[in-house]
Every structure is written in C-alpha cells, then in structure tokens.
Design a protein with these regions (language model features):
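Charge-rich, solvent-exposed alpha-helical interaction surfaces
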Residues: 15, 34, 53, 69-72, ...
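Short terminal alpha-helical segments
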Residues: 1-36, 93-96
Length: 98
C-alpha cells in the first residue's frame, strides 16, 4: 500500500484537529454536529476547500483497507474512530443527517 501523506489534506487536518479532537464528544456529541459547527464557523473559501478535500480524500482512500484509512485519520488529527467506511463517508459528507 502506498502511504497517503496527511500533508496532502490541510483543510481536513484543520477540521479533524479543531472539531473531531479528543473532547469532541463533550463539545459536539456527534461527528454530524461537529461538521455543522465547522460549516457555521468557516467562511465560504474554507468550506469550499474542505468539501474539495473530502471528495479527493474519499477518492484516494477508496481502494485502501479501512485499517489504513483509520491510521490516516489519526495522522490527520482525528480522535474519532468511525466504526465503518460508510459511517466515515456519511460524517464527512453530511449524509448522516439526511
């Protein structure tokens, strides 16, 4: 497996470190609420970069084993461990609320 550099995803690193950190459950309760809060806090350019990176992240990680994806999430600063790839996709795309 080719290692995906966390540095390729600065907007995701900012989101994970700022919203899905070790205290996110106490602060937000769920990844969906953390995402909504980020989107409310971010300006239009930050939201655009985030959504572009989410799309690229999901494309790049699609062929990877989920364990490798979880390691990448940790390197990006996430302290949330999604139970499945589908849960990760739903959380990052806001589909968890739909």
């Amino acid at each position: 497996m080719k290692r995906v550099p966390a540095s390729d995803f600065p907007a995701l690193r900012q989101f994970f470190g700022g919203y899905l950190h070790e205290d996110f459950v106490e602060e937000y309760g769920t990844p969906a609420v953390a995402l909504k809060t980020f989107e409310a806090d971010a300006d239009e350019d930050e939201r655009r970069r985030f959504h572009a990176e989410v799309k690229r992240f999901l494309e790049v990680t699609a062929p990877l084993d989920f364990a490798d994806v979880l390691r990448l999430l940790s390197r990006l600063g996430s302290r949330w461990t999604p139970p499945t790839r589908e849960a990760l996709i739903a959380a990052l795309t806001g589909a968890a609320d739909r």
